[in-house]
Regions:
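Flexible glycine/proline-rich
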Residues: 20-23, 35-44, 49, 54, ...
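Short glycine-rich, flexible loops that bind phosphorylated cofactors or substrates
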Residues: 107, 161, 258-260, 306, ...
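Phosphate-interaction motifs
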Residues: 2-173
Length: 409
């Protein structure tokens, strides 16, 4: 028999705020309360994807010496001016030239390299050339790549593979970086079980928080997932307090809606402040955006597609902001709708789209719009944002698709 609940026991949404307003408001509040991220020094070889805390300048030049850029012979360029096929020149080893390989030191009096394919061997001590070279031709001078004292990477730069190579070439072995923002993740719900547990009716595998773990890593954070907690006010409260103490921000999975056992809003209000409860997006409306002890605490809906869009629109920019990174927009393509698409009118809707190229143009087809259909995200090539207060789009209409992955032509 269904439980009869007094309406006063249910949560009420404070307000369904427009997405842009909600994001702007919450990020401003987050930034105002943010302290400078902690720093640490790490080996350059282990800093891929980490953000620099300060500018890094080269300690040495690269190359550190004048180096041969080719296999061949090093020569005195001014002494072979004018040689050609009609007037070749025979050179003597140790007097006029030395054999060199790529990377070998070029020392005085030599100042150019003739490529080995332009050298004819006469005997063990002599070669003939019929092609001149310019001063310093085929020589990498000191500092051609990096000059000692040169800026290699600025502060707040997310280090890439090529940056690591340049740092090492510039004599840098360690670099000061911002510690990765630590994000605590609390799965809630009596029905939640870990992946691999024996399944029974009424139980749901916790996949959302594993998705959060992966996304946090992708955006430069360090996830700290806790064991699932049941729908018990005191237990969830203790879990939140522990997570807030141990992390830079906290995500609470499920419990953000208006049910009698959705405790997230009440707990955030008790322990801190609720800035926003309810955003005018579909899926993702029940999002809770708050602060406890000055740290961002975000209540994320339990439906997986809702969870993804709340994460992308709120959690992602908070993580990026903690390390001074830009929230770069996804690439957008123009595509023609394959069929009519009706709007919800009340909300900005994120419609998952399948895209392909037909007859020289992109065509987009909407996938299942349910908030619980994870496979609509897996199969989607992109997202169509359908603004609120419009009736939708007609078949054949051109729309903007935000790409989640490259589209096969």
């Amino acid at each position: 028999m269904a439980k009869i609940v007094d309406i006063s026991e249910r949560n009420l949404y404070l307000k369904n705020e427009d997405l842009d307003d909600a994001v702007s408001k919450y990020l401003k509040m987050t930034e105002a309360g943010r302290t400078r991220a902690a720093e640490e020094t790490v080996p350059v070889t282990g800093c891929l994807g980490i953000v620099t805390a300060e500018p890094v300048f080269a300690k040495i030049s690269s190359p550190y010496y004048n180096a041969s850029a080719m296999d061949g012979i090093c020569v005195k360029a001014l002494e072979i001016v004018g040689v050609d096929e009609r007037s070749p020149r025979v050179l003597t080893l140790h007097e006029d030239f030395e054999f060199v390989d790529t990377g070998d030191v070029i020392e005085e009096p030599y100042n150019a390299v003739v490529m080995i394919e332009d050298v004819v061997t006469v005997d063990d001590a002599h070669v003939r050339i019929a092609k001149p070279v310019a001063l310093w031709q085929h020589v990498r001078p000191i500092g051609e790549d990096i000059v000692a004292g040169e800026l290699i990477v600025p502060a707040f730069h997310k280090l890439r593979a090529m940056d690591i190579g340049a740092l090492l070439a510039g004599g840098i072995l360690e670099v000061a970086v911002l510690k990765k923002p630590r994000a605590g993740i609390i799965p809630t719900g009596t029905e939640i079980v870990e992946a691999g547990s024996p399944m029974e009716k009424g139980k749901i595998i916790d996949s959302n928080t594993r998705m959060f773990e992966a996304l946090i890593k992708e955006y430069g954070g360090e996830p700290a997932r806790y064991a699932p907690v049941p729908d018990d006010y005191a237990v969830i409260k203790a879990a939140i307090q522990k997570a807030v103490a141990e992390n830079d921000m906290v995500l609470i999975s499920a419990g953000s809606s208006a049910g009698t056992e959705d405790y997230t809003r009440a707990l955030v209000e008790e322990l801190g402040e609720v800035a926003i409860h309810g955003v005018a997006i579909k899926p993702g409306k029940p999002a809770i955006l708050g602060f406890i002890e000055g740290k961002p605490v975000i209540g994320i809906p339990g439906y997986p597609v809702s969870a993804y869009f709340v994460f992308e629109n709120f959690v992602k920019p908070v993580i990026l902001g903690m390390t001074h990174q830009l929230n770069v927009s996804r690439p957008v393509i123009k595509a023609t709708l394959s069929k009519r698409l009706m709007s919800t009118l009340k909300y900005l809707e994120f419609v998952r789209m399948k895209c392909g190229k037909v007859g020289g143009r992109f065509v987009a087809t909407p996938l299942d719009r349910g908030a619980g259909v994870t496979m609509s995200l897996v199969n989607a090539d992109g997202i169509l944002r359908v603004p609120k207060n419009i009736e939708g789009y007609e078949a054949g209409q051109e729309v903007d698709i935000e790409l989640l992955r490259p589209v096969e032509e």
